[in-house]
Amino acid sequence: MEANNNTKGILFIMIGMAFFSIQDSLIKYIFEEIALFELYLGRTIVQATVLISIFLITKKKFTLKTHYPFLTLLRVICFFFGFSFFYISLTFMSLAMVSALFFSCPFFMSIFAKVFLKEQIGIRRWSAITVGFIGVLVVLNPTLEDFNFFKLAPVACSLCYACSMTITKYTSEKDNIYTQLTLLYIFAVIASVIIFLISGDGKFNNFSDPTMQFIFREWFVNPAVSWPYVFVMG
């Protein structure tokens, strides 16, 4: 039974990664037409709409009450910053390089699983993870002469994602997936709206660098072009 569940889990991960690849390609295509957190807000609204539709169709019951308030807050913060780091990295790095650096995630996740979840990880898995992490170091090219700290953005994303997934694994014992998703979307909307109220008019966009413009650009400048893609990504 456990082997069958592992196979299903791997299959779902592969399907999810395929969809993420499509999303990442679309982000690289439209990032000059939209602000970072406008994109984040749009995706969240679409995903929340899908989730609400599932609730209405299946008549599933859920609650906003969590048994792990602190861990839940930490999880949604990690998700928020993790995706932000990833989106930012797509503005100045190739999709292939970002994806390669994101593969540092299994390294962090395995450490967290061992330390915090007390899971047993065999020598074969550690060997595969180590080889993968060496590949990440090769891509980073961490030499003192020309090391680019901006390349750490997808690695920071991996660290945040590994942290959030570890917390999700732990809290799933009492909090169901619908509660966790709903709280994630609520936090993302609140955080995005706050950022919009502070900088949504573009008053801090005094930069010529495309990445910094992506972060501080005025919101809703060209929604007819950007939001159809946001809808697809959601």
Task: Indicate where each model-derived feature is located.
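Membrane-interface interhelical linkers
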Residues: 1-15, 49-74, 123, 186-233
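Structural motif at transmembrane-helix junctions in multi-pass transporters
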Residues: 32-38, 85-102, 177
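Hydrophobic transmembrane alpha-helices of multi-pass small-molecule transport proteins
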Residues: 124-141
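Hydrophobic/small/kink-forming positions within alpha-helical transmembrane segments
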Residues: 17-22, 52, 76-84, 106-111, ...
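Membrane-interface helix caps and helix-loop-helix hairpins in membrane proteins
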Residues: 88-93, 140-149
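Specific transmembrane alpha-helical segments of multi-pass solute transporters/efflux pumps
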Residues: 61-96
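C-terminal transmembrane-helix exit sites in multi-pass transporters
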Residues: 105-127
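Transmembrane alpha-helical segments that form core, pore/gating elements
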Residues: 28, 37, 146-204
